[in-house]
Amino acid sequence: MMSNERTLLNQLIKSKTDTVGSEILKEIEGNDEYIKDVQLKKLKELHDKKFKEKGVTPLIRLYEKYNACALNDGDLQNWAELIDRDIRILEGTIKILEDESNEG
């Protein structure tokens, strides 16, 4: 029986035809290559597109919408400083007038 098994093993090893196991292995390897080369690439592109649509693009829109307001806030700060200076001048003038009227 040992020689029969050895003969079958030699035939299997030297065989030019595919076995069921080798056909399944080739199919698995082909599927693996397809998944890595095609499906994974498409999935990455889809993910990148969805990420841009859901995350990046809305942030860019918000930035563009409120960036002009941020620049106006800088103008607002300048206006506030000018108004503060004018109020201090008016307060100083009123104090001088009150002091003069109290003396006279």
UniProtKB/Swiss-Prot annotation:
The keyword Transport applies. One of its GO terms (cellular component) is endosome. It comes from Kluyveromyces lactis (strain ATCC 8585 / CBS 2359 / DSM 70799 / NBRC 1267 / NRRL Y-1140 / WM37) (Yeast). Disulfide bonds: none annotated. It is found in: Endosome. This is Biogenesis of lysosome-related organelles complex 1 subunit BLS1. Component of the biogenesis of lysosome-related organelles complex-1 (BLOC-1). Keywords: Endosome, Transport. The gene is BLS1.
